[in-house]
Design a protein with these regions (language model features):
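Short alpha-helix
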Residues: 220-235
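A conserved beta-strand element that flanks and buttresses the S-adenosyl-L-methionine
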Residues: 123
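A short glycine-rich, Lys/Arg-flanked "PGG" loop and its adjoining helix->strand segment in the class I
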Residues: 137-149
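Core SAM-dependent methyltransferase catalytic element
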Residues: 235-256
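Conserved class I S-adenosyl-L-methionine
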Residues: 1-47, 61-65, 154-186
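Class I SAM-dependent methyltransferase SAM/SAH-binding core
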Residues: 53, 61-109
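Conserved S-adenosyl-L-methionine
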Residues: 56
Length: 256
């Protein structure tokens, strides 16, 4: 099946979105709260009709919630994953508020693929831990050039404080115990979800290409909140601090 066939196939894209949400919530039961606070801060800083870059957009989870809350917003989603982009393309087909771009964030020239030179807000969630610190720092420098003055960048992700190993171990044990209970009730984990996608007649091709790019999972990094805030300031943002956190994750906001 070609990419054109994927975009025009009759498929329940919303069902795939919901399946992705359930799989992600298995890891992050407070995922919706992160999104709510993220959009609260978008409204607080840049208003209700922002031009947004959904960075490493995946299926477009941020974009969907952005447009539901702010109908006058526009979103550019950028990702490299063919399968997740196929779901995003199917979901937002015909919506001229959404542009989807295929690009590798490790490519220094990826911003040239975007339809705009600047954005009010760049938003990302549970994605940039796939990058090691050096390419992530380089990415932060490029983002500083994309966010307009007074605009924001927000990253919701795993940010580990390595100075608190006992607290980290206790949190990790509790989280994994909860995840095991959920698995016994039939919740799909990461591997099972991708196995399901590989069997779908529409997503099988994009999923195969996805594995050619990434393998089973990328080997990334989870530096501390302090590291992220320091590097963002060094790369051109004026302010940076957490605006929400859970025992394992943080939503960090940087203002240009």
């Amino acid at each position: 099946m070609t990419d054109a066939d994927t975009r025009t196939a009759t498929t329940d894209w919303q069902a795939w979105q919901e399946s992705w949400d359930r799989q992600q919530e298995w890891y992050m039961p407070d995922r919706e709260e992160r999104f709510r606070i993220m959009l609260d801060m978008v409204e607080a800083v840049v208003g209700t009709a922002p031009r947004v870059l959904d960075l490493a957009c995946g299926t477009g989870s941020i974009t969907a919630r952005l447009l539901a809350r702010f109908p006058d917003a526009t979103s550019t989603g950028v990702d490299l994953d063919p399968a997740l982009l196929a779901i995003a393309e199917g979901t937002f087909a015909g919506d001229d508020r959404v542009t989807l771009v295929t690009a590798d964030l490790k490519d220094p020239d990826w911003p040239a693929r975007l339809p705009y030179e600047s954005y009010d807000a760049v938003l990302t969630a549970t994605a940039l831990h796939w990058l090691h610190r050096e390419p992530l720092a380089e990415l932060y420098g490029r983002l500083a050039g994309l966010v307009r003055d007074g605009g924001v960048f927000m990253n919701a992700d795993h940010m580990i404080d390595e100075t608190t190993p006992r607290i980290n171990a206790a949190e990790r044990a509790q989280r994994h115990a909860r995840m095991e209970q959920a698995r016994q009730s039939g919740v799909l984990g990461w591997t099972e979800w991708w196995q399901l996608a590989a069997k779908d007649p529409v997503l099988a091709g994009p999923t195969a290409r996805r594995y050619e790019i990434y393998g089973d999972h990328a080997d990334g990094d989870t530096p501390s909140v302090q590291w992220h805030a320091r590097v963002l300031r060094e790369k051109g943002f004026g302010e940076a601090r957490p605006v929400w956190c859970s025992p394992s994750d943080t939503l960090l906001l940087a203002m240009k």
